[in-house]
Amino acid sequence: IGGGAKSDEVALEVTKKLEGKTLEKDAFSFQLLDDQCNVLQTVKNDENGKVKFEAIKYKEAGTFKYTIKEVNDNKPGYTYDANVLKATVTVEDILGEKLASVKFEDSKKEFTNSYAAKEAKLQLEAKKVLNGKAIEAGQFEFELKENGTVLHTVSNDANGKIQFPKLTFTKEETRTFTISEKAGDVAGVEYDPNAYEVTVVVKDNGQGQLVATASDADNITFTNVYKAEP
């Protein structure tokens, strides 16, 4: 019994909490140590966060001190609780019977970990083609929009490459972006009116890292045509 009830044996019990992710059974390990720092038991949490050690039976009266700590196995994305919990078991001899009681220094008796996958970054690109004339760096402008709001405006380089600043994603989600050319007024140029929709799906890879994947993002090409005015 881990909460102060009387018996000749004690099963120490604490609680595991996890922030940022659903706690799974056997996700974390915990050690029970005696006052000489010897590891007596190692157990894992259940699906409800309960951490229960096997009962210790006492044959003699006395005071017994224990330390409970979590094993930091460095799982990616997790921040571990470095605190230790201290418990004192007092065993009394009453009329020949051993009666044990438990007292924890910290009444909460909890270990709290947190999980946060590292952010993902993704750079969207496109290509600019100009028929009828050599393309120049900075000649045309392009917009990256989300829900009608312009996030970035960039221009092509001398090879027609279009690169938007990297997008940052901090959680699992699905977002839709639109890439289009900003209509200009260069004489003799017929602008490409097309807009391309790109869907980005962000997933946790289970190793502490978010991964962003774009669909319909390959081979986005804007083609303008130049015809010299008569």
Which sequence ranges carry the predicted segments?
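Solvent-exposed loop/turn and edge beta-strand elements of beta-rich ligand-binding domains
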Residues: 1-230
